[in-house]
Amino acid sequence: MMGFGASALESIEGEEALEVPGPPPEPRAPEPRAPEPEPGLDLSLSPSPLPESPKARKSSPGQRKGRRGGSRRGRQVRFQLAPPSPVRSEPLLVAGAPGDDHELEAPALQSSLALSLELQNARAAVASGQFDASKAVEEQLRKSFRTRCALEETVAEGLNVPRSKRLYRDLVSLQVPEEQVLNAALREKLAMLPPQPRAPPLKEVLGPGPDMTMLCNPDSLWSESPHLTVDGLPPLRLQARPRPSEDTFLMHRMLRRWEA
């Protein structure tokens, strides 16, 4: 039993001796890095040695020996983002520093800074005894928007201008009659239609005219014939003359009337 216990103790001590981790692998020499970009745009990667996990320490001795032998070849590399470059901190401008241009503190129209400046001037005038109350009231009334509106109302009443025109001068009436809206829509639709051909105006119907042979006898008329040469007259050239379309129907009506 003692021998068996001694052998077991020796085997346990041997395992503990094997489980003692060796020195960590030496990191590579730092390579020259590229210039760091601006913060927010840094996408560079830097290698870092993989820390040994606690599970690797409890692994079998055979596996640990194999890892020690091939640590240089199969070592894992973890990449992480480079830390952002330090931003240059500019010294803040002191509010009360003399000789500085405070562009943001310039009093503007209708601003709280302008009102505070006027209040400070009024307090300084009261403290020095140069404050004129009547003049201040007159100046305020001259600048007041309410006073100007009330004055315009009074002038408009004196000129007999209706109150509706003074209040709603540039507004559009929303109570439009339905008939007016329909007429406007109908006019728009008609304007989009092509123009219709217009019918010719009706001519006045003429009555029966006088008889042309009332004062003459056709049998007593003399006829003249031209003295032609051997060649005779040159052949006439026929030329078409454009006539309006309504002349055809007018001629037809006249012939029917004469036949009757």
From Swiss-Prot:
Disruption of the gene: reported phenotype: Mice homozygous embryos for the Ppp1r35 gene are lethal during early embryogenesis. Homozygous embryos are capable of initiating and completing gastrulation as well as specifying the anterior/posterior and the dorsal/ventral axis, but exhibit a developmental delays which are the result in the failure to progress past 8.5 dpc to 9.0 dpc.
Gene that this sequence comes from: Ppp1r35
Modified residues (Phosphoserine): S46, S53
GO MF annotation, one: protein phosphatase inhibitor activity
Family designation: Belongs to the PPP1R35 family.
The protein's assembly and partners: Interacts with PPP1CA; this interaction mediates the PPP1CA phosphatase activity inhibition. Interacts with RTTN; this interaction allows the mutual recruitment to the centriole.
Primary role: During centriole duplication, plays a role in the centriole elongation by promoting the recruitment of the microtubule-binding elongation machinery through its interaction with TTTN, leading to the centriole to centrosome conversion. In addition may play a role in the primary cilia assembly.
Subcellular compartments: Cytoplasm, Cytoskeleton, Microtubule organizing center, Centrosome; Cytoplasm, Cytoskeleton, Microtubule organizing center, Centrosome, Centriole
The keyword Cytoplasm is annotated on this UniProt entry: yes
Lineage of origin: Eukaryota, Metazoa, Chordata, Craniata, Vertebrata
Keyword set includes Lipid metabolism: no
Chain segments carrying region Disordered: 1-100
BP GO annotations: notochord morphogenesis; positive regulation of centriole elongation; positive regulation of cilium assembly
GO cellular component: centriole; centrosome; cytoplasm
Keywords tagged on the record: Cytoplasm, Cytoskeleton, Phosphoprotein, Protein phosphatase inhibitor
Superkingdom to which the source organism belongs: Eukaryota
UniProt feature, compositional bias: Basic residues: 64-76
Protein name in UniProt: Protein phosphatase 1 regulatory subunit 35
